[in-house]
Design a protein with these regions (language model features):
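A charged, amphipathic alpha-helical module
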Residues: 163-180, 185
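Phosphate-/polyanion-interacting regions in eukaryotic proteins
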Residues: 68-159, 186, 521-524, 532, ...
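Core alpha-helical transmembrane segments of integral membrane proteins
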Residues: 179, 183, 187-202, 210-221, ...
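Glycine-rich hexapeptide-repeat left-handed beta-helix
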Residues: 6-10, 14-24, 30-53, 57-69, ...
Length: 618
């Protein structure tokens, strides 16, 4: 911003001749090289500071106008250099506007008493009628939000986190609304109590109230036609367009909300895509997608998730209120018309078909199909391991990360086989083997928590789980051998026990517990330090993964340590398992091609990509 000086008497006369008026000309200050001839029909109230008008401003591709202020009412406003502000139907009141901005054909831009800009807003996700388990603020990421939700019942920890966030917000809170540099706001009705950072564009929005748009040179924010946003924060690279309505929401980096989607008290992180449908009290972690008008995401925690059309969740038992919730772990899907009765927990990479009752808990049976057939509920464990859909998903997600390197606040680990998911597979394999042992082999079906597992599906589930285990062990060992041919045992015990998925961050539970203790003991003194702890864990992921996997390999093969001879055996098992996996996926693709409506070129290209998998064996 400039150092401003008082107007000269000559400048005042020029302004008056251009039909400008001021409540008090002595309260109007300007930049040193200010040119009054670029202001027309402007009314000035209170303290107003105005920059220079030296450049042209591009208002549309190939169409430029000179910077200036025309047809506007300003009160208590500071304006940077080379802005074009024109046709303000109502007024601009209590705002600071940066350099190189274009503001045109809008009604009101105002900061009122008590403005929060969406910062510090407490929202209740999962439990729709809860007390507010996530605090919205500019530095929020998926890990911190998931951490808050998970530990909300720990009052001491909750209070520590709230105090750190309050301090962070207080240190950054401006005295009035701000518009950054290179911002474009056109054809928009009302903006009240908002911070709009650099390189944002608001085009045709209906109303923005108590919001922060976190644009930057590396990721601009775009707000489009008909959008209403209240008490919300929208992060770098996000777009909210085509009559979307959001209230009490956080929209994370590179998220896209479009086509009349509506959401309240929900959070969306890292490349999530929402169109047409609705969300309420939803925790949408990285790569959550819903495309259909008839889909409702309510009371659920999701990540790497795809909602089929007419997906619905029931969070209300019509007794104590809409307080029930569920978790669909990473990679889950719901088919068209799927319905899930909360509370429920689905293991990683599960797929739901039909109206699923009995509050399923399949965390320890991941990669499952859950199928409702009338009143009967079926569970097909491990089925999703060998599908075309899974193969395409795990290949596409890394390619679809649209975030700039500078704007990756949420940590996203793309490993589909990790100590977290493989830990579930190990438990699932034991569950299936135990069911077979207890019930015997001479039965047509098994029962697991009121879900029917057909006998053939149980046997295949054990087989598919074992394929996944061998693929995982071989892949990790192959990576270790490249940097350490001697296969040195892990230098740490961190990671050898249970793991968790904190909305994209795969981490040992022990490290999460260490963060909890450090927060309570005051060893983490700022939000930035807390975020850095999550980043440190992610940096050490391969080290912790090796500690867990080394122990797992020894347990699986019944060996005290891994020798080079063992490594050769594990690699052979890896190649066999991987080829079996690819063969099963190829069968799945052939079944779909046989339906008759898949173009042969598409099928052949997919099969060719499978055939190339042999290149990654060594």
């Amino acid at each position: 911003m400039n150092d401003y000086r008082p107007l000269t008497s000559e400048e005042i006369e020029v302004l008056k001749s251009n039909d400008c008026w001021a409540e008090d000309w002595t309260s109007v200050n300007v930049a040193e090289d200010f040119k009054p001839n670029f202001m027309h029909r402007v009314m000035l109230y209170g303290e107003v500071n105005i920059g220079a008008f030296n450049k042209n401003v591009e208002v549309s591709q190939g169409f430029v106008k000179h910077a200036g202020i025309n047809n506007a009412t300003l009160r208590n406003v500071t304006i940077g250099d080379d802005c074009l502000i024109e046709n303000v139907g109502n007024y601009v009141n209590n705002y600071t506007i940066g350099d190189d901005c274009y503001i045109s054909n809008r009604s009101t831009l105002e900061t009122t008493e008590g403005a929060t800009y969406g910062e510090g807003n407490r929202v209740s996700v999962l439990n729709e009628v809860g007390e507010g388990n996530v605090i919205l603020f500019s530095d929020l990421n998926s890990q911190l939000a998931a951490f808050m939700v998970k530990h909300f019942s720990d009052k001491e920890l909750k209070e520590k986190i709230r105090q750190l966030i309050k301090t962070d917000i207080d240190n950054k809170m401006p005295e009035r609304g701000q518009i950054g540099n290179n911002v474009k706001i056109v054809n928009t009705k009302e903006i009240t109590n908002c911070i709009i950072n650099d390189f944002c564009e608001v085009n045709g929005a209906a109303r923005l109230s108590d919001c922060t748009l976190l644009g930057s040179a590396h990721g601009n924010v775009y707000i489009g036609t008909g959008v209403i946003a209240e008490n919300s924060i929208i992060a770098e690279g996000a777009s909210v367009i085509n009559s979307v309505k959001i209230q009490d929401c956080y929209v994370g980096e590179a998220c896209q909300l479009s086509n009349g989607f509506t959401a309240s008290t929900s959070v969306f992180f890292a490349n999530s895509y929402m169109s047409n449908g609705e969300a309420c009290a939803a925790f949408c972690g990285p790569f959550t997608a819903s495309h259909h008008k008839s889909s409702l995401l309510i009371g659920g925690m999701f990540s790497f998730y795809n909602a089929g059309s007419a997906t619905n969740f029931s969070n209300h038992a019509y007794k104590m209120g809409p307080m029930h919730w569920g978790i669909l772990e990473r990679g889950s899907k719901t088919a068209s018309g799927a319905y899930l009765l909360m509370p429920a927990t689905l293991g990683s990479f599960s797929v739901c078909f039909g109206k699923l009752m009995h509050h399923p808990n399949t965390r320890n049976l991941p990669f499952a199909y859950l199928i409702a057939d009338g009143d009967k509920m079926f569970l097909i464990p491990g089925r999703n391991i060998t599908t075309v859909g899974l193969y395409r998903d795990i290949k596409k997600w890394p390619k679809r990360d649209l975030r700039a390197q500078e704007n990756r606040k949420s940590i996203v680990n793309f490993d589909w086989l990790s100590p977290f998911s493989v830990g579930e597979i190990l438990k699932g394999k034991k569950i299936l083997e135990s069911l077979r042992e207890v019930t015997g082999d001479n039965v047509s079906q098994y029962l697991y928590h009121e879900y029917i597992i057909p006998a053939s599906s149980l046997h295949k589930g054990i087989k598919y789980y074992d394929i996944a285990l061998r693929i995982y062990m071989g892949a990790v060992l192959k990576r270790v051998l490249k940097r350490d041919p001697a296969i040195t045992p892990p230098a740490t015990q961190v990671g050898t026990s249970d793991w968790d998925d904190l909305s994209g961050l795969l981490l040992p539970v022990s490290e999460e517990e260490r963060i909890v203790n450090d927060l309570k003991e005051g060893n983490i003194e700022s939000i930035q330090q807390l975020i850095e702890r999550f980043e440190e864990i992610d940096t050490n992921y391969r080290q912790y993964q090796w500690a867990w996997t080394y122990k797992m390999i020894c347990d699986y093969y019944g060996i005290p340590e891994i020798t080079l001879e063992d490594a050769n055996r594990i690699h052979e098992d890896y190649i066999k398992a991987r080829r079996s996996w690819i063969a099963e996926i190829k069968k799945d693709a052939e079944k779909e091609f046989a339906m008759g409506d898949v173009e042969e070129e598409v099928f052949r290209n997919f099969v060719n990509s499978l055939n190339q998998e042999v290149d990654y064996e060594n």
